[in-house]
Amino acid sequence: MNAYEWIQSVVLFAVLLLAIKPMGSFMAKIFQGDRTFLSRLLVPCESFIYRVCGIDKDEEMGWQQYAWALLLFNLICGVALFFILLLQGVLPLNPQKFPAFSWHLALNTAVSFMTNTNWQNYGGESTASYFTQTFGFAVHNFLSAATGIVVAIATIRGFVRRRVSKIGNFYVDIARCTLYLLLPVSLVFAVFLVSQGVIQNFSGYRTVPLVQATSYLKPKLDATGNALKDPKGNSITETIQVKEVTIPMGPVASQEAIKELGTNGGGFFNANSAHPYENPTPLANVVEVFLMLLIGGSLTYTFGVMAGNTRQGWAILAVMLAILVTAVGTLYWAETSGNPLVAKLGVHGVNMEGKETRFGVAGTSLFTSAATGTSCGAVNAMHDSMTPIGGMIPLSLILLSEVVVGGVGTGLYTMIAFVVISVFIAGLMIGRTPELLGKKIEVREMWMSIITVLTSGILVLIFSGLALVVPSAVSSMANPGAHGLSEVLYAFASMSNNNGSAFAGLNGNTIFYNVTGAIAMFLGRFAPIVASLAMAGSLAQKKFIPASLGTLPTDKIPFALWLTLVILIVGALTFFPALSLGPIVEHLIMLGGK
């Protein structure tokens, strides 16, 4: 790295660490019902919402009631978005006259935004109207993020509370999360992004002539959207000449802020955060990385504050950041090492294919690692154009169940599941009943943790295997061999883990991928949520056990190292065979010069 790249990285993580404590403390106040500096302004709004919706803010729920309320709320929101997409053609704020989504694309997209995945089998600027973007996607960016956060808070309450059956009120939690946390922070950073050049308007698209006409080759597609191929298996192309270009407009800044803050990731434009209207400057790029990591990282401190042991929160954060920094460094090394196949053609240097020159390799490595370590899934470069090892880094971060730092809320409750598993295994090794924060870890907690951790892995392997044998799914693959396998594996890893990023080269807008993807996203989101809430309900009913000489300290460096090892071992045992057939084989082929 040069001096600028070092400064960029160091300043980012330094500012993040400085923000963890105040933001974590602020969130603890929000969810403990304490007054904050926003209370004077927002309490009337909060009370109005409760009054209109008939919510008793003092009535709490058991874990089953909390889970049912969460599922019902999200299903209603998802169905509403589904019909917005089906009726897009007749709804207002559609200056480009975009037609309705097909039923299977509407299903996939509605589930995608409902589950905080933001997987997009469409191009935003060529498919979605301003009404859809604003009242459909942007609204769900807030609500899906809030859903993940409140599940993490409910899980924390399971450790904090003693001999009770209640873990909070879902409706109160999601209202306070949206009002006091997501809306104010998004507003501040939306204004900042506008200052950097991100657009915010409802104007129609603008068509302007090019100074010089250009042409490019475009693959021909059949009626189903799949690439046509000649008898030798090569794609059939046609030459397209371009004399003018249409510049899309739209309310981008307001959606961009919550897209990163809520680790949603769905781009207003097809190019996502590589587009200059979403991410125009290197400073905006670093700030967007900061937003991705802010809430997920700060929730670890919230955990420590609410549990009465802030060192526990710092220990979990240290594990998250250690893996993240390692991923950033490995990705940077892989991309700066270049491609030996290209070097043979006389093109030496770093691999800049698919990257924006305003960000460079360092800015791309930071953004890519943060977006896949969290559940954000935003991209500022083409992941498919990275070297095999470079592409394996974001894939591996997703496959680790996104605990680095993880999505807002999802990262923490998944990491807590890993902590429970680590404590349980360590307890078996030393012959002690496992304990965590004064609560016994027994069979029920272990089962719920296993469901939380392994659900996504099971979905990835089942659906990836299915996609490699179903003819209609195989026809969606534009690349054969190891790279084609990597693309399929990445797609279902991204959907099952609610990430949303993708490798190119795979036509996902088919009935097979839209329907199976919707199933993977739904189960990958809500099975771990229900399991985490069930664990919280079980823990809340247990008595507190004071620490003794035989208690395993979980806030010290040895346990942090043990937790890191468990996370990596679970990921390796689950996915190493698949990675061996995909990016690892592809890397060996590249080194072999083939």
From Swiss-Prot:
GO CC terms, sorted: plasma membrane
Superkingdom in the source lineage: Bacteria
UniProt GO MF annotations: P-type potassium transmembrane transporter activity; potassium ion binding
Localization annotation: Cell inner membrane
Membrane topology term: Multi-pass membrane protein
One Pfam family in the UniProt entry: KdpA
Keyword annotations: Cell inner membrane, Cell membrane, Ion transport, Membrane, Potassium, Potassium transport, Transmembrane, Transmembrane helix, Transport
TM regions (residue ranges): 11-31, 67-87, 136-156, 179-199, 286-306, 314-334, 411-431, 450-470, 517-537, 559-579
InterPro entries on file: KdpA
Function: Part of the high-affinity ATP-driven potassium transport (or Kdp) system, which catalyzes the hydrolysis of ATP coupled with the electrogenic transport of potassium into the cytoplasm. This subunit binds the periplasmic potassium ions and delivers the ions to the membrane domain of KdpB through an intramembrane tunnel.
NCBIfam families membership: kdpA
Subunit comment: The system is composed of three essential subunits: KdpA, KdpB and KdpC.
Family assignment from sequence similarity: Belongs to the KdpA family.
Protein known as: Potassium-transporting ATPase potassium-binding subunit
The organism of origin for this protein: Citrifermentans bemidjiense (strain ATCC BAA-1014 / DSM 16622 / JCM 12645 / Bem)
Gene it is expressed from: kdpA
